[in-house]
Amino acid sequence: MSNAMHVAKTGLNAQNSRMQVIANNLANVNTTGFKRDRANFESLLYQIKRASGEQTSVDTNLTSAFAVGTGVRVNNTQKVYTQGSLINTDNALDMAIDGAGFFQVLLPDGRIGFTRNGAFTRNQDGVLTTPSGYVLQPEIAIPESVTQINVSSDGIVSVQIPEQVDAQEVGQLQLADFQNRTGLQPIGENFYIETTASGPPVLENPFAAGFGKLIQGALESSNVNVIQELVDMIETQRAYEVNSKAISGSDDMLRFVNQNL
């Protein structure tokens, strides 16, 4: 395989990976709390034919290098944590974060998962959980015979119990945030886990300095912009086609050499 073919092949692989990222974004356009991904590229090693500053004669030096690149690759995929639109549901156990922060959930393996999906329900013990049954942290239990559930913007959960005049406070919701959110590891089901890159979680009540407020009876929609994703898809298709043509052009050159030399 010629060097040009190899370089173009890396371009095909990189654009294919970007297309997968775009397809995943579009697939999750209606996923509550989903944050879109972005593929970041980086160039591969360069072959230095002649270095900058290399002496070309007794009195002259090369002012710029003769360096040939060997291609491109996807360096990483990065989550874009912009705010999604808030959708009213009128469900007392639906909560949206307006601003920074993540809900904390106890995963089956004992780790803490972090999510922007605030669609909660109650299990058989009245404890707030995700629809999959993962318990919200800190654990909050709602008494069985309540007539109303209220969640304040700063995370205080209170309920109205029959035959009691005053509402009863049953828990305090807490949010987590990170110094480097892009260092979080997505694991599926709309959950992230902390890594050494993200740093440990910073825990605070909602509406504290640097944290968002809670909105009861609402959910945060995906932040995927369908039009932008379609534009990116067309751009990726064009780049893929150009790299394919580079392979075809290199093949034509090799065929010419084989047939005429």
Identify the role of each PLM range.
Residues 1-261:
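Amphipathic alpha-helical polymerization modules
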